[in-house]
Amino acid sequence: MSSGQTSISSLRKASEQDLPAVLQLHRAAFPAEEVEQIIQVVNELWSDTTDATHSALHWVITAHQTTIVGHLSLSSITTQDNQMVGWILAPLAVVPTHQGQGLGSELVDHAIRHAMRSHQPRILVYGDPAFYGRFGFDRQQAVNVKPPFPLTQPLGWQGISAKGKELQHPIELRCHAALMHAQLW
């Protein structure tokens, strides 16, 4: 292991006590002009009171047993009549000092495994096609899902589904209230 790499001790489900460290992680990982918006999203996703219909799951990666260096949220997505049809991956962050070491990939792989074992094995993401494409996300898997707002970067709207579980009919997406802000899309 090179001196720039860190011993990763665990990938685990996040707890309430992790929220302050996760917020600090996002402050370090995102550009200044995006930080407050991302912090609001994380806080709302973490709160059980902001959305009774859509649940959110959080995972963190720690280094040296205690320092949180990565975070990913996966929240449920539904149709207009509140039928769950899968998950949306947002946000994902790794502290800059630990980027390039595969931690983001480890979190995404874990989220995919979780979703594929669930009763709705599908994940949507609005992000970098080059990064998410490495995991099997593609635009075709998201073509039947209308996002809640017009996309500023349409190529970033991608999905991944278990074989045979692709959406056959168009749906209009509903997601956690934390993600229902036009400026995020």
At which residue positions do the language-model features occur?
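Conserved active-site alpha-helix within GNAT-family acetyltransferase domains
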Residues: 117-121, 126-152
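Short loop segments at secondary-structure junctions
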Residues: 64-66, 97, 161-166
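Conserved acetyl-CoA-binding loop-helix of GNAT-fold acetyltransferases
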Residues: 89, 94, 100-113, 125
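Conserved glycine-rich acetyl-CoA-binding loop
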Residues: 67, 81, 95-106, 118, ...
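Active-site rim helix/loop that mediates acceptor-substrate recognition in acyltransferases
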Residues: 19, 23-64, 69-73
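C-terminal "cap" of GNAT-fold acetyltransferases
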Residues: 147-185
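A conserved beta-turn-beta hairpin within the catalytic core of GNAT-like acetyltransferases
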Residues: 77-89, 99
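A short beta-loop-alpha structural element at the N-terminal edge
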Residues: 9-22
